[in-house]
């Protein structure tokens, strides 16, 4: 199965708008029982979340996982930091990438693969405002071209 494939449960669409994603890595997550139940129900958000590396371990912060409806007193904190499961070599690559100018680690999407929740994280460089405007112009031009082809093909 390809990297990033499986049932997508949450996506960070803003990451593609705010960053030039250069490399992606698949990571597992350490979750509690109520967290995985909420995630499978589609109650997770990657918006404004980020990955940081402390003491040789990767952690995702600010990822919101809503409390499980039937979780009662065993429920989890919705915004707690969750450990990512990566090999040491992968963590070393991420540390090296972050030390370069302007690079950051952003979560791209969360999905289920072979029964396990996985997180696709990307190493990206922040876009400037003019880069975002150029991307918007290109998308608009592409849409316009498709519209004209579509109208010419109808007779």
UniProtKB/Swiss-Prot annotation:
Residue numbers spanned by region Disordered: 127-155
Composition skew (Basic and acidic residues), residue ranges: 127-149
Gene designation per UniProt: smpB
Any single GO BP term: trans-translation
Protein name: SsrA-binding protein
Protein's cellular compartments: Cytoplasm
UniProt keyword annotations, A-Z: Cytoplasm, RNA-binding
Physiological role: Required for rescue of stalled ribosomes mediated by trans-translation. Binds to transfer-messenger RNA (tmRNA), required for stable association of tmRNA with ribosomes. tmRNA and SmpB together mimic tRNA shape, replacing the anticodon stem-loop with SmpB. tmRNA is encoded by the ssrA gene; the 2 termini fold to resemble tRNA(Ala) and it encodes a 'tag peptide', a short internal open reading frame. During trans-translation Ala-aminoacylated tmRNA acts like a tRNA, entering the A-site of stalled ribosomes, displacing the stalled mRNA.
Signal peptide: none
């Amino acid at each position: 199965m390809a990297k990033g494939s499986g049932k997508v449960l949450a996506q960070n669409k803003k990451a593609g708008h705010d960053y030039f994603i250069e490399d992606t890595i698949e990571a597992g997550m350490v979750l509690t029982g109520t967290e995985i139940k909420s995630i499978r129900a589609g109650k997770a958000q990657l918006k404004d979340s980020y990955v940081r590396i402390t003491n040789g371990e990767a952690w995702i912060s600010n990822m919101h996982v809503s409390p499980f409806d039937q979780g009662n007193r065993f429920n989890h904190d919705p915004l707690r930091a969750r450990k990512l499961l990566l090999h040491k070599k992968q963590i070393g690559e991420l540390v090296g990438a972050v030390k370069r100018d302007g690079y950051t680690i952003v979560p791209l999407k969360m999905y289920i693969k072979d029964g396990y929740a996985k997180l696709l994280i990307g190493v990206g460089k922040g876009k400037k405002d003019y880069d975002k405007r150029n991307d918007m112009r290109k998308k608009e031009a592409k849409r316009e071209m498709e519209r004209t082809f579509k109208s010419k093909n109808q007779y």
